[in-house]
Amino acid sequence: MIVGIGTDLVGVVRFGESLERTPALAERVFTPAERRTRDGAARSVTSLAARFAAKEAAAKALGVPSGCRFTDCEVVQADDGRPSLRVSGRLARAAEVRGVTAWHVSLTHDAEMASAFVVAEA
């Protein structure tokens, strides 16, 4: 059963400018693992923008619990390569209350826009 659906669209250039203007923003929004690729290289702004969109989409799918931190939602890569979410803190509690047992995540981006679509399933 679908518990919630969320989507978000992020302007890559504007997001990159925000990261440049406020270097600590990346640490407040992304976990250390999200800021790096599997081989340890820094993620591109485009990739980070897509992950930010996924965090926003996940919050929308659950109705944005108050007091949530962006790092309560981590975009991870499943064993088969698909993106997925690992939730913690208040977001995890909200997901548990709503009976969420699985997350379905789709990310896409080009040079200008990044988008995410998230389905919370029970």
Swiss-Prot record:
Enzyme Commission number(s) from the entry: 2.7.8.7
Catalytic activity, reaction form: apo-[ACP] + CoA = holo-[ACP] + adenosine 3',5'-bisphosphate + H(+)
Subcellular localization(s) per the UniProt record: Cytoplasm
Keyword DNA-binding part of the UniProt annotation: no
Top enzyme category: transferase
GO MF terms, alphabetically ordered: holo-[acyl-carrier-protein] synthase activity; magnesium ion binding
Binding site for Mg(2+): 8, 56
UniProt keyword Magnesium, yes or no: yes
Gene Ontology biological process: fatty acid biosynthetic process
Keyword terms, alphabetized: Cytoplasm, Fatty acid biosynthesis, Fatty acid metabolism, Lipid biosynthesis, Lipid metabolism, Magnesium, Metal-binding, Transferase
Main location, first listed in the record: cytoplasm
Residues in coiled coil: none
Cofactor(s) required for function per UniProt: Mg(2+)
Listed Pfam families: ACPS
One cellular component term from this protein's GO annotations in UniProt: cytoplasm
Its biological purpose: Transfers the 4'-phosphopantetheine moiety from coenzyme A to a Ser of acyl-carrier-protein.
Similarity remark: Belongs to the P-Pant transferase superfamily. AcpS family.
Name this protein carries in UniProt: Holo-[acyl-carrier-protein] synthase
